[in-house]
């Protein structure tokens, strides 16, 4: 029952405060640890495919295990001092593991700049939440990028952390965030990370396999509750959910594309390199800035479904 309260409290904290810039965030420290471990391992292992595979595997083992042990020890120590202190620490970290409000704030900034007609500012705003190159994006491209990242991060930034914190509290949720951060930094199929980032990418695929599919189903339900096209969401999800190199990334994107009646994904540039990617959804109408707000609403509704059912099940199980 304490875990359910910690999750509920963390959700409320994220909904109210988001991720204040002045407050240190665990993902920042995870990123620094990844960079330092990568530098350390690359300097000491052979610069061969086998050496890079080994180095990436060592990093993919050390960071999640270290995160789980450290956060678990802190939560245990706090609970030993006083149960309410343990609950407070869990709530705080659960809130930091969620990214719903931050995602909505950033995507809304993109929407605001598009409505002003300021394409350079919109490109800059969307560059804060996507990994692709944004310098040459059209207004339609900026809108697509924002909608796609809301859909994908509904799983990575909200539903998946919720699932893991319901299973194992803040320590397991932050361990998931460590895995997700590794994939964000290392999981590229370019010359630098083709071998070194493989273990991180595969681990992220495993960690997101169930959450991404659950998130897609919740998104389809949210489409019905927000007066979007739930039937279209179901149809496009069934058809296009595998239209991505990752087995998970197209799950919520396809549901979102179908719910909105637009086409997402397609080719993009990353770090100056062209990546051909299949499209997701049918272009029943042109995408428009308001689709960013529609995606935000569906993400919020889906996350509340996940919270309500997850806490109810967790509370029932004890």
Name the predicted role of every residue range:
Residues 184:
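Glycine-rich phosphate/dinucleotide-binding loop and adjoining beta-alpha-beta core of small-molecule
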Residues 1-175, 179, 187-318:
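Hydrophobic alpha-helical transmembrane segments
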């Amino acid at each position: 029952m304490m875990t359910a309260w910690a999750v509920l409290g963390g959700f409320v904290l994220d909904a109210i405060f988001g991720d204040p810039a002045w407050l240190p965030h665990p993902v920042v420290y995870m990123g620094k640890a990844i960079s330092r471990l990568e530098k350390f391992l690359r300097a000491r292992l052979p610069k061969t495919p086998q050496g890079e595979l080994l180095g990436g595997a060592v990093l993919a083992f050390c960071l999640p295990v270290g995160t789980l042990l450290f956060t678990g020890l802190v939560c245990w120590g706090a609970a030993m001092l006083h149960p309410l202190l343990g609950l407070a620490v869990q709530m705080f970290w659960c809130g930091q593991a969620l990214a719903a409000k931050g995602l909505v704030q950033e995507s809304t900034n993109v929407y605001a700049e598009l409505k002003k007609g300021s394409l350079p500012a919109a490109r800059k705003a969307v560059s804060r939440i996507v990994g692709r190159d944004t310098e040459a994006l059209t207004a339609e491209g900026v809108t697509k990028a924002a909608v796609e990242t809301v859909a994908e991060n509904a799983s990575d930034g909200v539903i998946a952390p919720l699932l893991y914190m319901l299973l194992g509290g803040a320590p397991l949720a932050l361990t998931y965030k460590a895995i997700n951060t590794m994939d964000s930094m290392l999981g590229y199929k370019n010359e630098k990370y083709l071998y070194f980032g493989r273990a991180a990418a595969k681990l992220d695929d495993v960690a997101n396999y169930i959450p991404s599919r659950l998130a897609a189903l919740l998104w389809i339900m949210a489409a019905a509750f927000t007066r979007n096209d739930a039937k279209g969401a179901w149809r496009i999800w069934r058809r296009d959910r595998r239209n991505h190199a990752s087995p998970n990334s197209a799950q919520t994107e396809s549901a979102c594309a179908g719910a909105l009646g637009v086409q997402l994904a397609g080719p993009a540039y990353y770090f100056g390199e062209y990546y051909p990617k299949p499209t997701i959804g049918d272009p029943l109408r042109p995408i428009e800035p308001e689709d960013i707000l529609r995606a935000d609403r569906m993400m919020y509704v889906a996350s509340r479904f996940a919270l309500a059912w997850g806490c109810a099940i967790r509370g029932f199980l004890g």
